[in-house]
Amino acid sequence: MGGIVFYRNNYSADLSRSDRYYIEDGSSKPSPSGKYLNRNECLWGYVEFGDGVKKYTDKAYCSVVDMTNGCIVSDWDGEACGYSWVGNKDVLASSGGVNADKFDFQSMCPVINKIIDDFSGIDEKDIANLIRCDSPSKENVNTYQRMAKENKKAKRVVLKSISEYLSGITEISTVKTKSNLFTLPNDNNKTSAYLVPGDKVRVIQTSPDNKWINIGYINAKGSPLISWVRTETLE
């Protein structure tokens, strides 16, 4: 059983799944631009049917990988696995005809802010892929903070990605008075935690009314914390 590993510059990521096998037979093709790879895979194992009977099965799957970051953009089975790249655009279709069925794989790309379920049940592999597809930014870093609290198995990898994001923020401010921490920019979401005068924080963004600042703080142990504070508590 083969595997699939993504390499780019000094970064690598194992994209394999333990319940699938990977055989390169020439059917996995890059898109016209070279940005995506349409990869064919097989699922193997025993599947339990409605009557309680377990049967061994092989099932074909296809996944599109973004070759710029290793993101598995979409993962599916069925008829769409027979689709191929057409023309000179990154379009998957049943044929090159004008009325051919097209598969909108890009709409399936994982986005953390679109996840409505509890984060605790998400597999570590899926979270690692989510980070590759939708890395921490000012739009989603607060959601990643919540994920780190709710999913203990993936806490380490999520906090690492948050730390990497914060390291790229150049705007730094200093706490001037005791600063209570809030999960959202309003008084109803106050936590028991706080920062003390002299603490250094990285400024992520300011609320529209300028009364709150979204900050990132890295404690003495190197663990990141994302929170909201009142603007007047910072220098």
Question: Residue locations for each model-derived region?
Answer:
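Residue-level detector of Asp-centered blade-edge/turn motifs that repeat once per structural unit
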Residues: 32-33
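SH3/SH3-like beta-barrel superfamily modules
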Residues: 194-232
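Short glycine/acidic-enriched loop and turn motifs that connect beta-strands
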Residues: 43-49, 98-103
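Acidic, small-residue rich beta-repeat scaffolds with periodic aromatic anchors
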Residues: 55-175
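Short consensus segments that form the blades of beta-propeller domains
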Residues: 1, 48-57, 192, 204
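Multi-bladed beta-propeller domains
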Residues: 11-24, 70-79
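Boundary regions of SH3-family modules and the immediately adjacent low-complexity/disordered segments
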Residues: 153-169, 216-235
